[in-house]
UniProtKB/Swiss-Prot annotation:
Sections of the chain in a coiled coil: none
Protein name: Linker for activation of T-cells family member 2
One cellular component term from this protein's GO annotations in UniProt: plasma membrane
Main location: membrane
Tissue-wise expression: Strongly expressed in testis. Expressed in heart, spleen and lung. Present in B-cells and mast cells (at protein level).
Keyword flag Lipoprotein: yes
Entry PTM: Phosphorylated on tyrosines following cross-linking of BCR in B-cells, high affinity IgG receptor (FCGR1) in myeloid cells, or high affinity IgE receptor (FCER1) in mast cells; which induces the recruitment of GRB2.
Length: 203
């Protein structure tokens, strides 16, 4: 065991040194990288500032050299156009709020432009009330079959799909001798009694 312990101490010390060296390299390498990026960023900003100030100086020098009438009026026209668009609401309420804008020298409206919905679309007037004679929207009873004249005061059920079943039921009631009401309506007949259940209870 002592031989194993003797080998374990130097190996663990070597691993510890290797780990420390790796950590030191990581810390050391990461710092200059950040500093380098910051330096590059600062250099870029300085170059951009120098270019923009040089452009401003040449522009001001160019304006001072030619004090006569302005030769290129395109920037001024675009500036006037922007002002016109921004302050078009000050012209008056009669002027339209939306306009078709034209591209360049085409003098044709842009194909992608869609005219806005007119304001009277939302300001509907009052609906006119239909005349009293017009009953096209009213409901009415519709018969499936043509009406037939009732025979001897008995209501006819020809209009229903199950009229054959109703006739058979009436005939069965007549043959059994059950009293029919004068009107023949099912509402005035006695309640249904389950005869089979009553017969089974008596047994």
């Amino acid at each position: 065991m002592s031989a194993e312990l003797e080998l374990l101490w130097p190996v663990s010390g070597l691993l510890l040194l290797l780990l420390g060296a790796t950590a030191w390299l990581c810390v050391h390498c990461s710092r200059p990288g950040v500093k380098r990026n910051e330096k590059i960023y600062e250099q870029r900003n300085r170059q951009e500032n120098a270019q923009s100030s040089a452009a401003a100086q040449t522009y001001s020098l160019a304006r001072q050299v030619w004090p006569g009438p302005q030769m290129d009026t395109a920037p001024n026209k675009s500036f006037e156009r922007k002002n016109k668009m921004l302050f078009s609401h000050l012209e008056g309420p009669e002027s339209p709020r939306y306009q078709n804008f034209y591209k360049g020298s085409n003098q044709e409206p842009d194909a992608a432009y869609v005219d806005p919905i007119p304001t009277n679309y939302y300001n509907w007037g009052c609906f006119q009330k239909p005349s009293e004679d017009d009953d096209s929207n009213s409901y009415e009873n519709v018969l499936v079959c043509k009406p037939s004249t009732p025979e001897s005061g008995v209501e006819d059920f020809e209009d229903y799909q199950n009229s054959v079943s109703i006739h058979q039921w009436r005939e069965s009631k007549r043959t059994m001798g059950a009293p029919m009401s004068l009107s023949g309506s099912p509402d005035e007949e006695p309640d249904y009694v389950n005869g089979d259940v009553a017969a089974a209870e008596n047994i």
